[in-house]
From Swiss-Prot:
Listed GO CC annotations: cytoplasm
Keyword check for Magnesium: yes
Annotated protein name in UniProt: Ribonuclease H
Localization of this protein: Cytoplasm
InterPro entries in alphabetical order: RNase_H (IPR050092), RNaseH-like_sf (IPR012337), RNaseH_domain (IPR002156), RNaseH_sf (IPR036397), RNaseHI (IPR022892)
Species in which this protein is naturally found: Paracoccus denitrificans (strain Pd 1222)
Domain called RNase H type-1: residue spans: 1-146
Name of the encoding gene: rnhA
HAMAP family assigned: RNase_H
SUPFAM superfamilies listed in its UniProt record: Ribonuclease H-like
Length: 155
């Protein structure tokens, strides 16, 4: 049986500042890789949390049909937000338990819509801990950020 996996990561130089997101996607048949796809992008002025969210959103929006997928992130913010907090936020009109507007509500709503048509299993792993797929997602996020970083002036 084929299985889909995505490893996602966000990066930011300054917080806020230029940022990028990266996704490594794989379709597997047991131990055999059927297909691999890499995605990345970035923004000139953003935050690390927004880039982490964009990575997860981009992975799910890249799927052309309803799918079962395991999304692995090193962001506890994304994992906890999408598996625990989002239900209360939706019930409270996108407000937190203390009635404050949810930060990044635009992206949380987009992530909620993106995952609605899929069966998503969310996993968290420690970042920068030697997981090759997570390291690749990090490289992609940094590549996505690169066009938005100011050029260094040497002299």
């Amino acid at each position: 049986m084929n299985a889909l996996f995505a490893w996602t990561d966000g990066a930011c130089s300054g917080n806020p500042g230029p940022g990028g997101w990266g996704v490594l996607m794989r379709a597997m048949d047991g131990d055999r890789m059927l297909k691999e796809r890499e995605l990345s992008g970035g923004e000139a002025e953003t935050t690390n949390n927004r880039m982490e969210l964009m990575a997860a959103i981009s992975a799910l929006e890249a799927l052309t049909r309803p799918s079962e997928i395991t999304v692995t992130t090193d962001s506890a913010y994304v994992k906890n937000g999408v598996t625990q907090w989002i239900h209360g936020w939706k019930k409270n009109g996108w407000r937190t338990a203390d009635r404050k507007p949810v930060k990044n509500a635009d992206l949380w709503q987009r992530l909620d819509a993106a995952q609605a048509r899929h069966q998503v299993r969310w996993e968290w792993i420690k970042g920068h801990a030697g997981h090759p797929e997570n390291e690749r997602a990090d490289e992609l996020a940094r590549a996505g950020m690169a066009p938005f970083k100011p050029a260094r002036v040497s002299g």
